[in-house]
């Protein structure tokens, strides 16, 4: 670039005279509502339609976590092959949602679920297997039976 042009551009940026600080660049803070408005305007351009009656949306990741939307707003544009899901999202483990999510799982997820099921009993057995030291400690907490209470109740009945 030409040095003269560069000097002109620098002179335009100065606010005061020679030796003063240059103006600060204005920082524009974006808010979530501004992003949401921009997203909604982009979706309007795609001519999306609202899909009613959807109670929940689950997106299953490869690592076994699930992105769960409860009562989301779902919009679709079939011509653009675009679906927009908006609402409060929660990230959960697949095992937390197991009873209700089984009907939604595909073949890939079912194989990963089988692997989880094979690992789960091993973990439970490892955690619940009582050690000999633990058994002795549990016996100390329970008092020994000294008398026979059945005989006392039979004597009262006679």
From Swiss-Prot:
Residues 33-98 form the NAC-A/B domain. It holds the Pfam family NAC. CDD domains: NAC_BTF3. InterPro entries: BTF3, NAC_A/B_dom_sf, Nas_poly-pep-assoc_cplx_dom. Residues 134-150 have a biased composition (Acidic residues). Residues 125-158 are annotated as: Disordered. Belongs to the NAC-beta family. This is Transcription factor BTF3 homolog 4.
């Amino acid at each position: 670039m030409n040095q003269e042009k560069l000097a002109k551009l620098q002179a335009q940026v100065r606010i005061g005279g020679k030796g003063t600080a240059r103006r600060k660049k204005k920082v524009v803070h974006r808010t979530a509502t501004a992003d949401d408005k921009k997203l909604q305007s982009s979706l309007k351009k795609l001519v999306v339609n609202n899909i009613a009656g959807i109670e929940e949306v689950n997106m299953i990741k490869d690592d076994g976590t699930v992105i769960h939307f409860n009562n989301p707003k779902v919009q679709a544009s079939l011509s653009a092959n675009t679906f927009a899901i908006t609402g409060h999202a929660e990230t959960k483990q697949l095992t937390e949602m197991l009873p209700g999510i089984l009907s939604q799982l595909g073949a890939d997820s079912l194989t990963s679920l089988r692997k989880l099921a094979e690992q789960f009993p091993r973990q439970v057995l490892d955690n619940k297997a009582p050690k000999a030291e633990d058994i002795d400690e549990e016996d100390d907490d329970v008092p020994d039976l000294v008398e026979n209470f059945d005989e006392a109740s039979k004597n009262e009945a006679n």
